[in-house]
């Protein structure tokens, strides 16, 4: 993990392999290079239009899959080709291990003369091997697993599926890639030697019983001894000993041929055959042995092997009746080992992608990317820089914990390609520790990821604290407006598996002929919640926005927008960064999806999604997923802002449509939805709508006043009269208005202005309380049954009293609560064994350091009360073997013919031994000691200090070096 950028690079490479490789941060710190390999195949569809792709997403070598086609009548498979990386890794690298891999499988190419692509895809990940799959038909593929994260069904071939390699474990070894070793000049032409993939081989043994061989029907006809499943994709070594005896002396020399056939999925034609022959004669018929010893290179395995068959035949008719009995000279076995067969990912798990009903001769495209840690061969190593792997427990544990919660986070091995692309932003957030996870919140994952961060990477979580979100109660913005708030506060509309697509595809309502209309605008995937608090603007206007859903045209919800002077495109989501212009190029506005039909004031404005207006005038705006604002209410707001509003932001929401004469406000529909959005922050809606009988659910008193026409915005003659009404409503003291209208307006703006009517204020609070607790329907039904409120009055005449403060729990319950609390803290720290019962037995104490260390090392539950002091490193104050310290100190301080080390240097060496628990210094400490010795030697000597005397050096014993050759003047 790169702590400078606070990015979990290993996890990012797993989730988004196309971003490049990243070293696996485990404790294998071998030198390596990072290598990314691509795979690209255009597979031609057969006449049947059906086939299957066998993918090995975790294979550490170059072979990543195979392609089969169904025959014309779909009764049998036909092998087409292997799927491999673009470079054969064993040509340049000796060792390697896989970091991550991804495939994209889809069709977008038509054969000549056709105009439509047909066909669907089914994909499933199977935890077993290929030979264990019972049926490979299109329909039966979905029965391989019940895990929804591991299968996709009936996906159009034009949409495609994505196969993602999720590690099944993190103890990945470096495997030999079957590279060829350098050969001598005298080697036979074509002869070569390779290092086989022999790490964790998968070994199969065929044990034959000590019984008579089944009789053959005729000479030269094979009789089966054993047939079964086996999975092989790499080089294989075969060994065997089949011994038997004949009941009678053979009349003629009889040849026994024992044949081991390796076969694939598609037919009974052997891929590789191993044969062992032996002659039974008069001399050996009491004990005949056929030996099998053969190596099969990877090149000879031309397709995946899933079956083996052992059989035999004879060449003499007279020997058919001569009974042969196995096991005369010992066990009869045939074994074969597949290289790297038990390395995770080589043979299991597999992902099967079946296609059906595709257009014959169309093209199925397979595009993959694989990331490796590789060690180059000696020739390549001369020109490449290798680097040590770095152990990063935080990065590794973070990846482990994220992937262990794959069900909760909906991380899959197979995806619909469009869904995988939707998750790209979320994956980038999860791997970025400096991110506050705004998109992850939209998917309902933020709490899980934050909890994992606190446990797996507490240091980085401290260095890069999450920005305190302003959202909190802001969940009401979407949750309340769409009526989808969950009981826990998270809105269902953005939950994984909920109506997130409807919300993400929402559009601001507007004219279909606008240049940024829904039909023309190309949506960007976005669900990024960011909130910014701005100081009070010089002026502004608030307008409602009605969002419609593309997939459900009848559904809609509302929100608010504030239009202020200035250019603030950085505060808009990517979908809203649209610049429109007033008529005759007299100004512009960001965030409006259509040009303004009237002239402006040569200024630039920005329409921002509004979250809240605070008491001090500050405004809180947010980035949301909707598209640019469109519609007549936005045009009305701009007209007011350009022509009438000179200072401040009116605490109300304006709606209406400007007529063609630009002097009249005509009625507009959708006021009920807009009222809900306006009353959420406590603002009244000022506007006009056709009809006065519509009822608005869950709104404040202002909605009723608007619907009944109490706050009119009627047709008027001339813009001055029109502006007169709106301008007076905007003023803090609306002089000139009707006295009754002024009183009603002030009462309904109790939350936006100072409270002037206590009864209306209580009524508004009561309505908010009823809505908050979801009692509106119940209260309405009660009002119909009890119109005079007789029963209800008796029920609520006496409000509930707070009971007396209860006494504290007794000692038993207090100890149980304490044990539960200690257990929760211990489990969060990683001590899963610390149940409340265990804590109680441990004298109501959490795990000690020794107990926790014992659990980490052995994986077993420690005994309560046992401190396991042997598992705690005991500090050693000072070693007792001072002779060892003095020898090392003299050796480090100087050569034998130099002066001995001073006492201060002895103390420094002793401190190192004490720090290391009795062990000697490591490389860094040795370097520090040498530097200390050089500093001590450079100290100026006092004239009065006598020079230390030392014994004269002993002369070297006579004799010659053992490296000097014999002779007088010989050269070395």
Swiss-Prot record:
Position of the signal peptide: none
SUPFAM superfamilies given in the database record: Positive stranded ssRNA viruses
Entry EC no(s): 3.4.21.-
Matches recorded under Pfam families: Birna_VP2, Birna_VP3, Birna_VP4
Biological process (GO), any one: proteolysis
Binding residue positions for a divalent metal cation: 26
Domain of life: Viruses
SS bond partners: none
InterPro entries in the cross-refs: Birna_VP2, Birna_VP3, Birna_VP3_dom1, Birna_VP3_dom2, Birna_VP4_Prtase_dom, Viral_coat
Record's compositionally biased regions (Basic and acidic residues): 801-817
An annotated GO cellular component: T=13 icosahedral viral capsid
Biased composition (Polar residues): 963-972
Magnesium as UniProt keyword: no
Functional summary from the UniProt entry: Capsid protein VP2 self assembles to form an icosahedral capsid with a T=13 symmetry, about 70 nm in diameter, and consisting of 260 VP2 trimers. The capsid encapsulates the genomic dsRNA. VP2 is also involved in attachment and entry into the host cell.
Protein's UniProt name: Structural polyprotein
């Amino acid at each position: 993990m790169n702590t400078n950028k606070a990015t979990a690079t290993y996890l990012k490479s797993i989730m988004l392999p196309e971003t490049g490789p990243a070293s696996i941060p485990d404790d294998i710190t071998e030198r390596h290079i990072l290598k990314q390999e691509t795979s690209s195949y255009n597979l031609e569809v057969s006449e049947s239009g059906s086939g299957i792709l066998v993918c090995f997403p975790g294979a550490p070598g170059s072979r990543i899959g195979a392609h089969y086609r169904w025959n014309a009548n779909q009764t049998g498979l036909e092998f087409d080709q292997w799927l491999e990386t673009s470079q054969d890794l064993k040509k340049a690298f000796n060792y390697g291990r896989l970091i991550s891999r991804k495939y994209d499988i889809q069709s977008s190419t038509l054969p000549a003369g056709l105009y439509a692509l047909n066909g669907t895809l089914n994909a499933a990940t199977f935890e077993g091997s290929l030979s264990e799959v019972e049926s490979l038909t299109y329909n039966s593929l979905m029965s391989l697993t019940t895990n929804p994260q591991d299968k996709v069904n009936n996906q159009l071939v034009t949409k495609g599926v994505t196969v993602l390699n999720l590690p099944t474990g993190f103890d990945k070894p470096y495997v030999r890639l079957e590279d060829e070793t350098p050969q001598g000049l005298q080697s036979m032409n074509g002869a070569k030697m390779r290092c086989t993939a022999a790490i964790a081989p998968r070994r199969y043994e065929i044990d034959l019983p000590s019984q008579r061989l089944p009789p053959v029907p005729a000479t030269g006809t094979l009789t089966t001894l054993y047939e079964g499943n086996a999975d092989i994709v790499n080089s294989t070594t075969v060994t065997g000993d089949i011994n038997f005896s004949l009941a009678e002396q053979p009349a003629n020399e009889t040849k026994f041929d024992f044949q081991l056939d390796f076969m694939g999925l598609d037919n009974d034609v052997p891929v590789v055959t191993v044969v062992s022959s032996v002659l039974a004669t008069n001399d050996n018929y009491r004990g005949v042995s056929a030996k099998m010893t053969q190596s099969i290179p990877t090149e000879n395995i031309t397709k995946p092997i899933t079956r083996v068959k052992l059989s035999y035949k004879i060449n003499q008719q007279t020997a058919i009746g001569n009974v042969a009995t196995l096991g005369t000279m010992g066990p009869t076995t045939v074994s074969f080992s597949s290289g790297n067969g038990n390395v995770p990912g080589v043979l299991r798990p597999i992902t099967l992608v079946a296609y059906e009903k595709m257009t014959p001769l169309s093209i199925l495209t397979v595009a993959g990317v694989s990331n490796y840690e590789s060690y180059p061969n000696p020739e390549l190593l001369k020109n490449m820089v290798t680097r040590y792997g770095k152990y990063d427990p935080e990065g590794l544990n973070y990846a482990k914990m994220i992937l262990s919660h794959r069900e909760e986070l909906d991380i899959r091995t197979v995806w619909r390609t469009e869904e995988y692309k939707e998750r790209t932003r979320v994956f980038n957030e999860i791997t970025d520790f400096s991110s506050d996870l705004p998109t992850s919140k939209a998917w309902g994952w933020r709490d899980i990821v934050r909890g994992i961060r606190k446990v797996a990477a507490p240091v980085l979580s401290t260095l890069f604290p999450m920005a305190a979100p302003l959202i909190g109660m802001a969940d009401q913005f979407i949750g309340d407006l769409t009526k989808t708030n969950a009981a826990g506060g998270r809105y269902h509309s953005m939950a994984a598996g909920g109506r997130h697509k409807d919300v993400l595809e929402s559009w601001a309502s507007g004219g279909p002929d606008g240049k940024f209309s829904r039909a023309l605008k190309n949506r960007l995937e976005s669900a990024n919640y960011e909130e910014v608090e701005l100081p009070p603007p010089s002026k502004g206007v608030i307008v409602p926005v009605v969002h419609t859903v593309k997939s459900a045209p009848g559904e809609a919800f509302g929100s608010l927008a504030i239009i202020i002077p200035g250019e603030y495109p950085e505060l808009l989501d990517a979908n809203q960064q649209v610049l429109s212009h007033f008529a005759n190029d007299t100004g512009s506005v960001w965030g409006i999806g259509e040009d303004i039909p009237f002239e402006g004031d040569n200024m630039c404005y920005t329409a921002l999604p509004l979250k809240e207006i605070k008491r001090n005038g500050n405004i809180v705006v947010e980035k949301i997923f909707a598209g640019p604002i469109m519609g007549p209410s936005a045009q009305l707001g701009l007209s007011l802002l350009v022509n009438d509003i000179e200072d401040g932001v009116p605490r109300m929401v304006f709606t209406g449509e400007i007529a063609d004469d630009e002097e009249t406000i005509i009625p507009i529909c959708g006021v009920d939805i807009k009222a809900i959005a306006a009353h959420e922050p406590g603002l009244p809606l000022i506007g006009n709508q056709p009809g006065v009988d519509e009822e608005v659910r869950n709104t404040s008193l202002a909605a009723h006043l608007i619907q009944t026409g109490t706050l009119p915005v009627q047709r008027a003659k001339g813009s001055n009269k029109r502006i007169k009404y709106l301008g007076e409503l905007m003023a803090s003291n609306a002089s000139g208005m009707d006295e009754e209208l002024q009183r009603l307006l002030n009462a309904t703006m109790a939350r936006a202005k100072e409270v002037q009517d206590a009864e209306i204020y209580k009524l508004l609070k009561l309505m908010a309380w009823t809505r908050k607790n979801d009692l509106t329907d119940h209260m309405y039904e009660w009002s119909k049954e009890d119109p005079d409120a007789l029963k209800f009055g008796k029920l609520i005449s006496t409000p509930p009293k707070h009971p007396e403060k209860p006494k504290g729990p007794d000692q038993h319950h207090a100890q149980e609560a304490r044990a539960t609390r200690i257990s929760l803290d211990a489990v969060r720290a990683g001590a899963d064994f610390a149940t409340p019962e265990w804590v109680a037995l441990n004298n109501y104490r959490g795990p000690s350091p020794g107990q926790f260390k014992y659990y980490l090392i052995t994986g077993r539950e420690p005994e309560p009360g046992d401190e396991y002091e042997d598992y705690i490193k005991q500090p050693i104050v000072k070693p007792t073997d001072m002779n060892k310290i003095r020898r090392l100190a003299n050796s480090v301080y100087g050569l034998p013919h130099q002066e001995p080390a001073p006492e201060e240097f002895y103390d420094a060496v002793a401190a190192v031994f004490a720090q290391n628990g009795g062990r000697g210094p490591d490389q860094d400490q040795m370097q520090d000691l040498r530097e200390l010795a050089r500093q001590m030697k450079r100290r100026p000597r006092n004239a009065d200090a006598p020079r230390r005397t030392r014994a004269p050096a002993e002369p070297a014993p006579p004799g010659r070096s053992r490296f000097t050759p014999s002779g007088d003047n010989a050269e070395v």
